[in-house]
Design a protein with these regions (language model features):
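Basic, short loop/linker segments at the boundary and entry of helix-turn-helix/winged-helix-like folds
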Residues: 9-56
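Polybasic low-complexity intrinsically disordered regions
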Residues: 91, 98-210
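General nucleic-acid-binding
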Residues: 1-9
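DNA-recognition alpha helix
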Residues: 61-77
Length: 263
């Protein structure tokens, strides 16, 4: 199928595929294998297909295969001579997720250049299919007891709400069991990260101090009758949280909940 240059330039899929190719060129990730048969589909083509699914709200790989088979313009744009089946999408997507997706995402954040001085961290429940053998049971604020996964992320909350770093765990992992996110967020140079009471932990305050940024959390009283029973960093946090400045700053944490509400 031949498509005129004008139609190509006005097609969203063409623009997306061009952006994907630029990203891969910068990452220099699509190195040809010297062993075995050459791949039938390039990494750029697989990523373009996955983005096609996102753009068209396609949540099943079988449906993705079916819809792409009908879209001859898209096939021509990304130079597909044959459509990958759903199992190929699954295998290739898992490989790309480990080695490439995060690099591309970090590149897009760099291009957007959001204000990162004020951020927030939280987690949200993601219910799974009852046939998912890898899912675990846990308790979430929104769903109560459920079976599935949990998305943990740190987002900017100043003007544009953009996830900076994230992790997906099973539902049985507590919110404060992913301290690695703090280390990953360091490259964005945050000044203050806001969090709910689940993160009111000496370990988290010590990590934040080591990384040279601040952590402000809601107060987790546990069995204490007052904040006077707290020691060290937890006491300092409680005082700041109850101060007028702390109250004002903490209001921005609601923005991460707004983000989760649309997931």
């Amino acid at each position: 199928m031949i498509i005129s240059p004008k139609i190509k330039s006005e097609n969203d899929n063409f623009k997306i595929f061009e952006a994907v190719k630029i990203a891969f060129t910068k990452l220099n990730s699509n190195i040809k294998n010297t062993k075995g048969r050459p791949r039938k589909y390039s990494d750029e083509q697989i990523v373009a297909c996955m983005l096609y699914g996102v753009k068209h709200s396609i949540f099943s790989l079988r449906e993705l295969e079916y819809e792409i088979k009908k879209d001859y313009v898209f096939q021509t744009i990304i130079n597909l001579n044959q459509i990958p089946d759903y199992s190929t999408f699954s295998l290739r997507a898992k490989t790309l997720e480990k080695h490439i997706y995060y690099g591309i995402y970090a590149m897009f954040i760099e291009l957007i250049a959001p204000e990162t001085r004020l951020c927030a961290i939280d987690a949200t429940a993601l219910r799974s299919s009852k046939y998912d053998s890898e899912a675990k049971s846990g308790k979430g604020t929104r769903l109560g007891y459920y079976r599935g996964y949990k998305l943990h992320c740190i987002v900017t909350v100043t003007d544009t709400i953009i996830p900076l770093v994230f992790d997906l765990t099973t539902a049985n992992v507590y919110d404060n069991q992913v301290p690695d996110l703090l280390y990953e967020a360091k490259i964005y140079n945050p000044f203050l990260i806001l969090a709910d009471a689940a993160y009111d932990s000496v370990e988290w305050f010590e990590i934040a101090e080591k990384l040279e940024f601040n952590l402000l959390t809601d107060i987790n009283m546990r069995k204490a009758k007052s904040i006077e029973a707290f020691i060290d960093k937890r006491y300092e946090n409680a005082l700041f949280f109850e101060s007028p400045i702390g109250v004002n700053l903490y209001k921005n944490r609601l923005k991460i909940e707004q983000l989760f509400s649309v997931l």
